Design a protein with these regions (language model features):
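Binuclear metal-dependent hydrolase catalytic cores
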Residues: 2-118, 206-243
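Short beta->alpha connector loops
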Residues: 99-102, 123-127
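Cap/insert and terminal regions of metallo-dependent hydrolase folds
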Residues: 107-108, 114-119, 125-229
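Short, solvent-exposed mixed-charge patches
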Residues: 246-247
Length: 247
């Protein structure tokens, strides 16, 4: 979906790819309807930067022909559908609708490479469609928001007279999954492991992680990892091995 925290790095990704590689076309950006508008906006915002760099480094190093982003849009799938949105060799990516209302379109992705698979929830409340579309994945990457901690933040905002933060911390409760709901989804999907990402709120001290994870082990039989920046997940093809390494 197109919330700012999910797209704000696109410009830098495209620029680093362009200036640091040997490409003959812009970076193709796949997404639901609306992605062309996002791509156009980033290209407009970065156009002057491109001109500066090409003038400085030359056409061979920073050619305009490979600069920026291009869009490949697909329609929001109906529940029960998971169209292929990217395919290359043994790699196949399908998209499915999730529940992040009032934000629409919002999708998750299932990524299959040979005999291994992962699914990425995107932002969503607990979703029956997600569970259906992710059956049997090796690893489910699922967002989670601790409603216990966010409600405490909401109470603190009210006490401090911060009406804006009080409103926001109330509004966000109903369009994200709780940690236990993420674990339930992994269990119902038959996933082998659950990696929780998009962790809300951040967990800067270890006692908060205990509060965040409360009840998850009762809801899911497999391995649970609360991810941090730098968490690395590897699934060797031709095996059932799942290697998860966090800093």
């Amino acid at each position: 979906h197109f919330h700012s925290d999910h797209i704000d790095g696109l410009g830098e990704v495209a620029t680093l790819r362009w200036a640091g590689g040997d490409w003959d076309s812009p970076l193709m950006t796949h997404g639901p309807d609306g992605v062309a508008e996002i791509v156009s906006g980033f290209n407009l915002a970065y156009h002057r930067d491109q001109a500066y760099r090409t003038e400085h480094h030359g056409l061979e190093v920073t050619p305009p022909t490979s600069w920026g982003l291009a869009a490949s849009a697909f329609a929001l799938p109906e529940d029960g559908e998971a169209p292929v949105v990217f395919e290359s060799g043994d790699l196949r990516v399908t998209a499915f609708a999730v529940d992040h209302e009032p934000v629409s379109p919002a999708v998750g992705y299932r990524i299959q490479y040979k005999d291994r698979s992962i699914a990425i929830s995107g932002d969503t409340a607990k979703s029956a469609n997600l569970i259906e579309m992710t059956q049997g994945v090796d690893v489910l990457f699922h967002e989670a928001l601790s409603k216990v901690i966010v409600r405490r933040m909401n109470a603190a905002a009210k006490t401090a007279g911060n009406s804006g933060m009080a409103q926001i911390t109330m509004d966000i409760l109903d369009y994200h999954a709780s940690p236990v709901e993420a674990a339930e989804s992994a269990q119902e999907a038959g996933a082998s492991a659950l990696v929780v990402y998009h962790v809300v709120p951040p967990l800067p001290i270890s006692p908060l992680e205990g509060i965040f994870k409360e009840g998850m082990d009762d809801a899911f039989d497999g391995e649970i990892e609360i991810s941090v920046d730098g968490t690395f997940v590897s699934l060797p093809a031709g095996s059932n091995e799942i290697d998860i390494d966090s800093p």
